[in-house]
Structures are given as structure tokens and as C-alpha cells.
């Protein structure tokens, strides 16, 4: 499956990644060494994650992040 990240807010992207992983917020958090409240805050857009965190998540979930010109 593929998404065009430009069409989504950062909080929507993290939720999509978690849902693709078929993990609960708790399971996803444990896999990343975070707590459930952190995941919940990201998904609700209360807190933003860094690019480094996104790259770490992508690596752990076996996802590829690409950047290309239009």
C-alpha cells in the first residue's frame, strides 16, 4: 500500500502507519519504547514527532520513505 504524505497531516500519517501495523496504541508504543500517551498525543496532533522519530518508526515497521520531485 502507498500514500502520498503531502495529502495528510503528520498526525494522520502516524495513525495510518500504526493501523497498517495492525497494532493497538499500546502495542505500537511498546515496540517503539514509548508510552501509549505519546502515541495518542501524536495521533491527535497535540504533540509533533521529529523527522528522526518518523524515520525510526519507518525502519521498525519496514516502511520506505521516499521524496521525489513532481
Q: Over which residues does each language-model region extend?
A:
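N-terminal flexible/basic segments that precede or flank functional cores
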Residues: 1-8, 20, 44, 62-64
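Residue-level preference for nonpolar/small residues embedded in alpha-helices
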Residues: 10, 49-50
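Short basic helix-loop element that most often maps to the first helix and adjoining turn
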Residues: 12-31, 56
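Residue-level recognition of specific faces of alpha-helices
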Residues: 13, 38-41, 53
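Recognition helix of helix-turn-helix/homeodomain-like DNA-binding domains
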Residues: 33-48
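DNA major-groove recognition helix of helix-turn-helix/homeodomain DNA-binding modules
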Residues: 50-67
